[in-house]
UniProtKB/Swiss-Prot annotation:
It comes from Orgyia pseudotsugata multicapsid polyhedrosis virus. It is found in: Secreted. Its main location: secreted. GO terms for cellular component: extracellular region. InterPro entries: Toxin_18. This is Conotoxin-like peptide 2. Residues 1-18 form the signal peptide. It comes from the Viruses.
């Protein structure tokens, strides 16, 4: 592959990863799933993001 093709594939991947990291839910906020929380831990019993 050419360098420009590799660059074209890598740039959107990096941009989407950064957007996902900024879109996470803060500790103490409501959540349903662990992947929604910045810490990666959602309380099943109470439904809020836990700290790690």
């Amino acid at each position: 592959m050419k360098f420009s093709t590799i660059l074209l594939l890598v740039c959107p991947t990096v941009a989407l990863s950064a957007q996902y990291a900024l879109a996470c839910t803060e500790t103490g906020r409501n959540c349903q799933y662990s992947y929604e929380c910045c810490s990666g831990a959602c309380s099943a019993a109470f439904g809020f993001c836990l700290h790690r």
